[in-house]
Amino acid sequence: MARFVVVPLFVLLSLFGLEAIQHPPKIQVYSRYPADNGKPNFLNCYVSGFHPSDIEVDLLKNGKKIEKVEHSDLSFSKDWSFYLLYYTEFTPNEKDEYACRVSHVTFSTPKTVKWDRNM
């Protein structure tokens, strides 16, 4: 009888332990194709390795939030950290600046990573 109580208790304690673990997200901003001014492309923000799962991700154009953005489903790795991909269509040019802004419990303020057209 004690064994039937100990196993579920161990599982519950393990789940609570996972919530206590915090890992900051790694943020990568890149385009699907090499940047070519005036040619349609996709801007991607890949956020990975974070825990817990609550996260806010915005793609920015000249510091303002881009409204038409899609994203993958929240997924997790073998180590129980999470990852997501946010993306939108865009047409690069010389004057506009693009970035990805991420808010997560591990950051005291949101972190913004700029798109480097040469990457």
UniProtKB/Swiss-Prot annotation:
Residues 1-20 form the signal peptide. Gene3D superfamilies: Immunoglobulins. One of its GO terms (cellular component) is extracellular region. Residues 25-114 form the Ig-like C1-type domain. It holds the Pfam family C1-set. GO terms for biological process: antigen processing and presentation of peptide antigen via MHC class I; immune response. Keywords: Disulfide bond, Immunity, Immunoglobulin domain, MHC I, Secreted, Signal. It comes from the Eukaryota. InterPro entries: B2Microglobulin, Ig-like_dom, Ig-like_dom_sf, Ig-like_fold, Ig/MHC_CS, Ig_C1-set, MHC/Immunoglobulin. The keyword Signal applies. PROSITE patterns: IG_LIKE, IG_MHC. It is found in: Secreted. The keyword Cell membrane does not apply. Belongs to the beta-2-microglobulin family. Heterodimer of an alpha chain and a beta chain. Beta-2-microglobulin is the beta-chain of major histocompatibility complex class I molecules. Component of the class I major histocompatibility complex (MHC). Involved in the presentation of peptide antigens to the immune system. This is Beta-2-microglobulin. It comes from Saguinus niger. The gene is B2M.
